[in-house]
Amino acid sequence: MVLSDILFSIYEHREKSPVFSWFAYLLRILDWIIQFLSFGLIPSIGGDLYDLVDNGLFKFVLDRNIQKKQNQLYDKFRLGTVKMCLVFDGELTKKLLLDNSIRRGGLYNLLTKFFGKGIFTSNIHSRWMKQRKAIFKLFSPQNLIQITPELTTSMFEELDRLITIKKDLDLVTVLSLIGLVGFCKVIFGVDVTDMSEELIEPLNDLLIYINGAVEPVLITADPSYRRFITNKKFVHNWMRKLIDKARKSENCFEIMRQQLDDIGSDDETELIEFILSVVLGGHETTARLMLGIIYSVCHNKEIIEKLNNETDEYPKGDYINLKKRPYLNNIIKEGTRLFPPVWLLSREAKNDTTIDNHFFKKGTQFLISPLIILRDYNVWGSNAEKFDPERFSNMDPKSKASKLYIPFIVGSEDCPGKKFAILESAIVVSKLFKEYEITVLKHKLNPMSAGTFRLSDKLPVSIKKLKN
């Protein structure tokens, strides 16, 4: 498959990923009985919940986007008693995100059951704003300049180790590992090489379970829930070890050390939940972004040639020179457009709200998908699903596409880690294609979601380091 010749459409490759829910199963039986006895005159209790359960969240959302009417801005539906609104239109999305009366809501309460008070995954709590400001400060340009050399070295030392000891490489796992090792080294001052691999599978299983969790009440007897608890305990213990090592490290970033001290040992669980959230935001989302970029670039020799020629022009891989590189930055922009780190988020109307003559009742739960907006043919043209870095070369800043390029969200809850994600992606993409030969082996893509958008759950590759 050559991506320069065909478009890779997530819509054509979307697959069912059914969710088993005891609640939905029992409710469906009750619904069937009521429908039978009432001759279908009483509305379904579950609403569209069964469609969500049968197809999985990813296909459910994409199907509704495909089925929308021309010029339809949003789709209101119901999951049980919860009123939902899936937004299709980019301009409306941006206005919702910028509206101070539209904030995190009920769906984040569900996430909090699983992740606790993580900054990226919980509802807003007492320390949330202070932690958010700390993350922004942590990833300031001045700090990114400082960490770039060590981040580069640690990630590629880990890559060299992996291609030496492993015969069969999975690019998904490789990117997760090098990102995790690099992130923990520069942020916490901790070398996690000897413990990184043990985290990947239970953390991944944790995310997959949460992605399919639709139970309003946790059913603790469910075997899948028990597996979730086992994985959660393991992941929390891993974070506990990381925290202990960070406290002893002389190289832990001072901003992060202050956060460790601020939460302290009095609430160990909250501290672990915060660190887990930071680690997830620092390596998991970026690894998924890099997967999409590397896969796309691998299939286009022209892009590789242009990229490597530019690398020759900017041989220094420091932060300043990476920022100066127009073609590399266009590759990263195109990657974040097609593979946004967070593909779906929720917001809640805290009051009755009217936006552009569209009325939304208090309590409405909005589903907002950057993935839909950033692949909208009405915004990005007929090649919206093609990987084409050139589209950013001469983009008019006043154009609709420029205004709706929001891969990291906008407003009061925009992504505090976006600068780090861009930096890490730029480092890996630039160095990987210049100093290594990477070949994608026989595979089948299966786009899916598990918190983040995933181009595939596995991608077999061959990676060889080139001789100088």
From Swiss-Prot:
Tagged with keyword Magnesium: no
Organism: Acanthamoeba polyphaga mimivirus
Membrane topology term: Multi-pass membrane protein
Source species taxonomy: Viruses, Varidnaviria, Bamfordvirae, Nucleocytoviricota, Megaviricetes
Enzyme Commission number(s): 1.14.14.-
Family of this protein: Belongs to the cytochrome P450 family.
Entries under InterPro entries matching the protein: Cyt_P450, Cyt_P450_E_grp-IV, Cyt_P450_sf, Cytochrome_P450_Monoox
Binding locations of heme: 415
Subcellular location: Host membrane; Virion
Primary localization: host cell
A GO CC term assigned to this protein in UniProt: host cell membrane
Keyword Metal-binding on entry: yes
Gene Ontology molecular function terms on file: heme binding; iron ion binding; monooxygenase activity; oxidoreductase activity, acting on paired donors, with incorporation or reduction of molecular oxygen
The protein, known as: Cytochrome P450-like protein L532
